[in-house]
Curated annotation (Swiss-Prot):
Classification lineage: Bacteria, Pseudomonadati, Campylobacterota, Epsilonproteobacteria, Campylobacterales
Keywords annotated in UniProt: Ribonucleoprotein, Ribosomal protein, RNA-binding, rRNA-binding
GO cellular component: ribonucleoprotein complex; ribosome
HAMAP family: Ribosomal_uL10 (MF_00362)
The name this protein goes by in its record: Large ribosomal subunit protein uL10
Pfam families for the chain: Ribosomal_L10 (PF00466)
Disulfide bond entries: none
Record-linked PANTHER family: 39S RIBOSOMAL PROTEIN L10, MITOCHONDRIAL
Family of the protein in this entry: Belongs to the universal ribosomal protein uL10 family.
GO molecular function, one term: large ribosomal subunit rRNA binding
Annotated function: Forms part of the ribosomal stalk, playing a central role in the interaction of the ribosome with GTP-bound translation factors.
Assembly and oligomerization: Part of the ribosomal stalk of the 50S ribosomal subunit. The N-terminus interacts with L11 and the large rRNA to form the base of the stalk. The C-terminus forms an elongated spine to which L12 dimers bind in a sequential fashion forming a multimeric L10(L12)X complex.
GO biological process: one example: translation
Length: 161
């Protein structure tokens, strides 16, 4: 890779890391290409990005983005996205699906290093769309119960008549 290409890559990652809600660093040692593609497809479905990057370039991009320092060693796969929950969910799903070869090393939430407990807890949270669905169900329940009651009352009066 040429120096100019490395600089372009760092600039691109810096811009994306600045806007990222969460950045998860994972170890993928021993994974097959098919398994990596599965992880990439999980991320693509959720509008999240996955990239295997050189350690030094990733460190420079994180520093330029104003994030806390992360020590990159061995093989690293970086998962990031605009939201805080989705990258955590994807990393957790991949870690459970490929237990032997995929582990979450560390993560950054809003540019600050997060503990593994935080990352695991965020992976268990519902997504924005799921939360909206839950809220709509809560709002819909009283109206639905009211209409069921009215229908039962109408049926009762009809049977009496």
């Amino acid at each position: 890779m040429t120096r100019t290409r490395k600089e372009e890559l760092v600039a691109e990652m810096t811009a994306e890391f600045k806007d990222a809600g969460a950045i998860i660093v994972c170890d993928y040692k021993g994974m097959t290409v098919e398994n990596l593609e599965t992880v990439r497809n999980l991320a693509k479905d959720e509008d999240t990005k996955v990239k295997v990057v050189k350690n030094r370039l990733a460190m420079i991009a994180l520093q330029n983005a104003g994030c806390e320092a992360v020590d990159f060693k061995d093989t690293n796969l970086v998962i990031w996205g605009d939201t805080q929950v989705l990258p955590c969910k994807i990393a957790d799903k991949a870690a459970t699906q490929f237990k032997d070869h995929f582990t979450i090393k560390t993560g950054l939430i809003q540019g600050e290093v997060a503990s593994m407990e935080t990352i695991n807890a965020m992976a268990k949270l519902p997504t924005r769309d799921e939360l909206i669905g839950m809220l709509l169900n809560v709002w819909n329940a009283p109206v639905q119960n009211f209409t069921i009651g009215l229908q039962a009352l109408a049926d009762k009066k009809e049977s009496e008549a």
